[in-house]
Amino acid sequence: MIPWNAYVRLLRLNKPIGILLLWYPTAWALWMANQGFPSIDLLMIFLLGTVFMRSAGCVINDIADRHIDRHVARTQFRPLTAGEVSLSEAFILLFILLCASLLLLLKLPINCFYFAVISVLITFLYPFCKRFLNAPQLILGLAFSMGIPMAFIASGKNLNSDFIVLFLINFSWIIAYDTMYAMTDKADDLKIGVKSTAIYFASYDRLIIALLLIFLHSLWLVWAINKNAEWFFYLLWCTAAGILTYQLKLIYARIPKNCFKAFLVSGYYGLVMWFAVGLALI
């Protein structure tokens, strides 16, 4: 019998937050590069590409961490670690996902290919960075930002000032929310020697997260003013600021379950800012 449930959990399809956090910045870029009206074809290519590559990243991560995950309370029952999915099955799934992603890539301009290659290489590298790099979230930030230049190029746009601002916003956002995520496993990571910004930032973790959130949310203002955005953008911007404030409140006591909740709340921030960008460009 094919273990479909285990496959779903291996690909994290039962936990779509990772897909959403990869999709929202790509959607922001598509809307910016197309003045609020991206084509259906582009939307479908990038949406499916997001699902395929996020799932591929999860498989790569679980293959690399299969001997580590059993020592972490939150990950010890992942399908590969628990033996529900074999290593060969995981590699087959990974091959299928990468082939599906390649088929989508063939529909995009050749310059997108270069960023896609960088994305795949970084995706393979990231799990191992947690073993030797004090801030592996920097690598994750690059991996989760590759959809932005690809969206601009696929839309026939240069990597202009909008791209630079959006890349900085997303890169900072990823470091902030993934540090919240890493705070969840900090005790286990310290025991087994896995590195993260939650450990590297030490007692300054909350302060650095707050500064990153202030920085990236301020950049949205810079972009909006440059675009002469209407009042409804600023209304949604204030709503999103409230979400960030709530996240900071959640992580204040550094309680693992609350830190994980703060990470999950990032999805709402991405959604609100997607609406804000869309309305600003109408």
Swiss-Prot record:
GO terms for biological process: ubiquinone biosynthetic process. Pathway: Cofactor biosynthesis; ubiquinone biosynthesis. The keyword Transferase applies. The keyword Transmembrane helix applies. Disulfide bonds: none annotated. Keywords: Cell inner membrane, Cell membrane, Magnesium, Membrane, Transferase, Transmembrane, Transmembrane helix, Ubiquinone biosynthesis. The chain crosses the membrane at residues 17-37, 40-60, 90-110, 113-133, 135-155, 163-183, 207-227, 231-251, 262-282. Its main location: membrane. PANTHER family: 4-HYDROXYBENZOATE POLYPRENYLTRANSFERASE, MITOCHONDRIAL (PTHR11048:SF28), PRENYLTRANSFERASES (PTHR11048). This is 4-hydroxybenzoate octaprenyltransferase. It comes from Legionella pneumophila subsp. pneumophila (strain Philadelphia 1 / ATCC 33152 / DSM 7513).
